[in-house]
Design a protein with these regions (language model features):
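Primary detection of the long, small/polar-rich alpha-helical "axial" segments characteristic
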Residues: 1-400
Length: 400
């Protein structure tokens, strides 16, 4: 009988040893890395899910970091704005002091003007030197770029002020803005028709209290005072009441200088002689203005006087137009702004694109004018027009 010698037992033992060693290596690798899946052979489907999850976690961490850095940039800008606000309030105080010409000497006004100029230079310096990680943020380089584009590219000449806080420009890097004004803002107005006078003059003595947006005054007129006399007296203190008067062919018209529902005119006849007809021909005792009504890219805007604004997920802007204007406006936002990536996916709905306006005194302005006009030798310095200077500073303080 013949015998066949084999090494099957050894082969089986080697196979078992290799398997055991492989499992040991896998176990040691899992223990050392803390990961169940270290390669595709461990769990192909699980590896794909694991890598996707790791990608999402990494992206989310970066998004959180981006949000923190965006907050740091805003905090830097806010700190600079606080300094500018303090300087503007100092300028406002200097303007008020310089207006007290009854006791303030020319030398004191000159000293105040020098201090105003110094404060304006400080504001310009802040605008040019405020940086975040080497990038200047208040010089206008992060503002949106606006051009007379849109459907017709018209109406921008009627815009007194345009502020774009946020815009989603999408992949085209531009957005057309179309604005239609259905109802322009109006002033508050009252009138006394010609029947309230005889030959354009009062029939009897008259005392009235006139109240407007800015204050109240009491007027006393004698019999025979003309419509022009009444208008002149009212206009003499129009800055205190906010109401202006005109003689329109014998009709005394009273209207606020301000527009919108916050503007009002109120006339109370305190006393009038028996022969007087002023009160009987007054069109009313109180009237208020109306706010502008506008549609921006199909969205109804919120109106306030001659200003209106919208705040949507794709566009956040505020516009101020010429008083009473109803001209359609079309323009294009074609780039600019600071982009903040706030989500894990690089898509527009997970980004914020914010416009940061320039704080330069030659740029920042309101309907009354630009801040640089307060410098010595310009039209709104402390010598030429302290009242106008105060109005400009008030508007700029509101914007800042």
């Amino acid at each position: 009988m013949s015998r066949i010698n084999t090494n099957v037992s050894s082969l089986i033992a080697q196979k078992t040893l290799r398997k055991t060693n492989g499992e040991l290596q896998t176990t040691l690798k899992r223990l050392s890395t803390g990961l169940r899946i270290n390669s595709g052979k461990d769990d192909p489907a699980g590896l794909i899910a694991s890598e996707n999850l790791r990608r999402d976690i990494t992206s989310a961490k970066r998004a959180i970091t981006n949000s923190e850095r965006a907050g740091q940039l805003i905090a830097t800008a806010d700190s600079a704005l606080s300094q500018v606000s303090n300087l503007l309030n100092d300028i406002r105080g200097l303007v008020v002091e310089a207006a007290n010409t009854g006791v303030v000497s020319d030398e004191q006004i000159a000293a105040n003007q020098l201090q105003v100029d110094s404060s304006l230079e400080a504001i310009d310096r802040i605008a040019q030197t405020t940086t975040f990680q080497g990038r200047t943020i208040l010089d206008g380089s992060l503002d949106f770029l606006v051009s007379a584009g849109g459907t017709n590219g018209v109406g921008l000449d009627t815009v007194e002020d345009l502020k774009i806080d946020q815009a989603n420009l999408g992949t085209s890097e531009s957005i057309d803005v179309s604005i239609s004004i259905s109802n322009p803002a109006t002033t508050a107005a009252l009138s006394v028709d010609a029947n309230g006078f005889t030959n354009n003059a009062l029939n009897d003595d008259l005392v009235i209290k006139l109240s407007g947006t800015d204050g109240t005054e009491v007027f006393t007129f004698q019999q025979g005072a003309t419509v022009d006399d009444l208008a002149s007296a009212i206009n003499l203190v129009s800055d205190a009441t906010g109401v202006e008067a005109t003689n329109n062919n014998g009709v005394l018209e009273l209207a606020t200088s301000a527009y919108g529902r916050s503007a009002f005119v109120d006339v109370e006849v305190i006393s009038e002689g028996a022969a007087g007809t002023f009160g009987d021909n007054l069109s009313g005792t109180r009237e208020i203005g109306t706010d502008i009504e506008a549609i921006v890219n199909g969205v109804r805007a919120s109106g306030n006087g001659n200003s209106f604004s919208i705040n949507t997920s794709t566009l956040d802007l505020a516009v101020t137009v010429d008083p009473g204007s109803n001209t359609a406006i079309n323009f294009t936002i074609g780039g600019g702004g600071a982009i903040f990536q706030l989500g894990p996916d690089v898509v527009s709905n997970q980004q914020a694109r914010i416009g940061i306006e320039s704080l330069n005194t030659g740029q920042i302005s309101g309907k009354e004018g630009r801040l640089y006009e307060l410098r010595a030798g310009n039209g709104k310095d402390l010598y030429a027009d302290p009242s106008g200077a105060a109005r400009i500073v008030d508007e700029v303080i509101t914007k800042v």
